[in-house]
């Protein structure tokens, strides 16, 4: 029987653990911000934050037409590494948003499909993204690097098309009942078919187009380091993230009921089919945009929800917040490490590959500690 002292001790350990993670988050953020792009050396934190403060003041002056904007060129010239610091800061925000979005998507999928191995790419989303990039590169070749709008249109459109196809095929296979198992099987089959198509087309692509496709698949939009492009990309991702995350947060109490069979969820007053459809649409938009920015990061969506349950418990609102925080932290760590690893002929180490190498052993340790299965 748990005593009051045991309860208070557990609460204290929990709070200390969360405080430790918060401190780790700040340290990793400062370290990643101070890494000089391409130089594998650090600038001083004082210089980095001074540049960010100057950038914020200049943006406010530009927006409200203040006299400070007339000194913009002179102030920037006297601030070492100004544009590099601002671009690095924007990339870090993009990285955190992508990590949070992909981890939250994995947590939602595992509840919606009542499957501890479910991931947001299982219903054809990843296949749609690859097909969209393939069509874009086949049409525009090297120009695809700078086409943010078309890239979103192609990949989001095909990702949603694959999702609709999977849901329709699952409904047909389940005899007008949307079977979760049938949807997962259909998604797996479509993924194999589209993967074969992508492989065949890649074999017949010119070397230049193949390099563009592989770069966009592994590095995403971060391959474009243009100052203005990075700013527009950040605003677009932030709008998509908030537009999808706010409804999911509002529906967080429904997910606890969705962890039960559909018949039981209906007795609780929910419409499981409607909840699942709305969530799949929101998660598809959020995860697709994140993959377009940071490349394929499949392991993160599988590992982070399990780590979150281990640290914060199995209540979905705790899992949701924990997944959001831990996903941002882990992907930011991967971003910092990848900036220090330069591969001749390839550039910096792909963040998606590094995320898989980091998350896999962490997930194995967490699952070994739990030993009692998935709640």
In which residue ranges do the predicted regions lie?
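Alpha-helical transmembrane segments in inner-membrane proteins
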Residues: 2-375
């Amino acid at each position: 029987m748990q005593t009051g002292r045991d309860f208070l001790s557990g609460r204290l350990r929990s709070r200390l653990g969360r405080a430790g993670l918060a401190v780790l988050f700040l340290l990793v953020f400062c370290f990643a911000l101070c890494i000089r792009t391409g130089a594998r050396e650090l600038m001083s934190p004082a210089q980095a934050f001074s540049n960010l403060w100057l950038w914020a003041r200049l943006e406010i002056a530009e927006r409200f037409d203040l006299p400070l904007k007339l000194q913009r060129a002179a102030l920037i010239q006297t601030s070492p590494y100004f544009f590099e610091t601002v671009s690095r800061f924007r990339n870090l925000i993009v990285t955190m948003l992508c990590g949070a979005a992909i981890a939250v998507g994995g947590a939602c999928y595992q509840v919606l499909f009542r499957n501890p191995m479910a991931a947001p790419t299982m219903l054809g989303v990843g296949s749609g993204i690859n097909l969209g990039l393939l069509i874009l590169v086949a049409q525009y070749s090297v120009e695809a690097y700078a086409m943010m709008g078309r890239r979103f249109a192609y990949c989001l459109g095909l990702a949603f098309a694959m999702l609709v196809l999977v849901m329709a095929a699952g409904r047909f296979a389940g005899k007008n009942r949307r079977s979760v198992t049938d949807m997962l099987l259909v998604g797996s089959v479509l993924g194999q078919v589209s993967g074969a198509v992508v492989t065949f087309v890649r074999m017949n692509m010119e070397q230049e187009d193949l390099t563009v496709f592989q770069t966009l698949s592994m590095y995403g939009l971060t391959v474009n380091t243009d100052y203005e492009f990075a700013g527009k990309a950040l605003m677009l991702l932030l709008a998509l993230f908030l537009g999808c995350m706010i409804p999911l947060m509002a529906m967080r109490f429904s997910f606890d009921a969705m962890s039960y069979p559909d018949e039981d969820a209906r007795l609780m007053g929910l419409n499981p089919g409607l909840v699942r459809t709305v969530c799949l649409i929101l998660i598809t938009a959020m995860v697709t945009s994140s993959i377009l920015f940071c490349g394929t990061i499949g392991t993160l969506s599988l590992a982070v929800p399990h780590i979150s349950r281990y640290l914060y418990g199995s209540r979905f609102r705790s899992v949701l917040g924990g997944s959001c925080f831990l996903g941002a932290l882990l992907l930011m760590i991967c971003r910092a490490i990848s900036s220090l690893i330069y591969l001749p002929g390839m550039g910096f180490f792909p963040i998606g590959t590094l995320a898989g190498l980091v998350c896999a052993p962490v997930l194995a340790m967490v699952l070994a500690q739990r030993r009692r299965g998935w709640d």
